[in-house]
Amino acid sequence: MRRLSLLTAVVVAMVVGAVLWAQERPAYFLVKVTITDQDAYGAYRDGFGSVFQQYGGEVLAVSAEPTVLEGEWEATATVIIRFDSRSEALEWYNSDGYQELVRIRQLASSADFILLDGRQQPG
């Protein structure tokens, strides 16, 4: 009986671990933008919301003047964007709608985009 209980506990732990491993973690874009043509950049800004909303992302922070504690951080704007998963983040970034906006943004600014995996949130 004791062996059966131990075996059951081990199997349950393995299943729970597998389920947690399979769950996708949130993903975050950290974006640093230097705008060189405000008027042209306006077209990117105007189209961003409607394309972005289709993919369930959330803009967590936007700052024109972040507090630099170490190093150098030259940018007109710094943005942090959250998606529920890396796959959703990449689906948005690689979408036809957003890639059309990327071409506009690239003519009006220079930008650095990085994608970070978030930590798995406890259940």
Predicted ranges, named:
Residues 1-2:
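N-terminal secretory signal peptides that target proteins for export/translocation
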Residues 5-7, 12-96, 117-123:
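Short S/T/G/P-rich N-terminal loop/turn motif that feeds into the first structured element of a domain
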Residues 98-115:
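Short arginine-rich
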